[in-house]
């Protein structure tokens, strides 16, 4: 006897799946494609980030070699940025005390030179005119910056005056009442 539930049916070859694992293979292929796409996306983003880091590093390295690359947008108009400071180079002339008063009115001081690179920048940028800086001394006393710290002899100061200025050869000194151009400086953080 034949059970009606167990009926054998003839199946033609066209009705058979081409590959018995075909459904599993398609799922595997889709997953593999997604994994490769994700891998390439991660690689692309990694290359972009590395390129940005390299570009920023190159710009930062140029800051020390070529100051014009690093002009600070944070500085007020007519001030020049260099190594996280803003500098103002006057066109007018005043004595040392009046020059400091002007700088003070701008929330700044006469320039304090903190490195050899900064000195070179100031000497190049100031042009041929002499400019007061924030270094002075009382008769027979050591040189002090406007903020009260002692000068550490980073560069020679010629002359016997009580106030320092930059000329075309470096630093020199003169009496406080002599009129010269001046350089103010302030941190670009305060701008």
From Swiss-Prot:
Which InterPro entries does this one have?
A: C-type_lectin-like (IPR001304), C-type_lectin-like/link_sf (IPR016186), C-type_lectin/matrix_domain (IPR050828), CTDL_fold (IPR016187), NKR-like_CTLD (IPR033992)
Post-translational modification, as annotated: N-glycosylated.
Membrane-crossing residue ranges in chain numbering: 39-59
Is Ribosomal protein one of the keywords?
no
Q: Which residues lie on this side of the membrane: Cytoplasmic?
A: 1-38
**Alphabetical UniProt keywords:** Cell membrane, Disulfide bond, Endoplasmic reticulum, Glycoprotein, Lectin, Membrane, Receptor, Signal-anchor, Transmembrane, Transmembrane helix
**Gene Ontology terms for molecular function:** carbohydrate binding; transmembrane signaling receptor activity
Tell me the GO BP annotations in alphabetical order.
cell surface receptor signaling pathway
> What exactly does this protein do?
Receptor for KLRB1 that protects target cells against natural killer cell-mediated lysis. Inhibits osteoclast formation. Inhibits bone resorption. Modulates the release of interferon-gamma. Binds high molecular weight sulfated glycosaminoglycans.
Q: What's the name of the protein? A: C-type lectin domain family 2 member D
Q: Which organism is it from?
A: Homo sapiens
Lineage runs: Eukaryota, Metazoa, Chordata, Craniata, Vertebrata
Q: Which gene encodes it?
A: CLEC2D
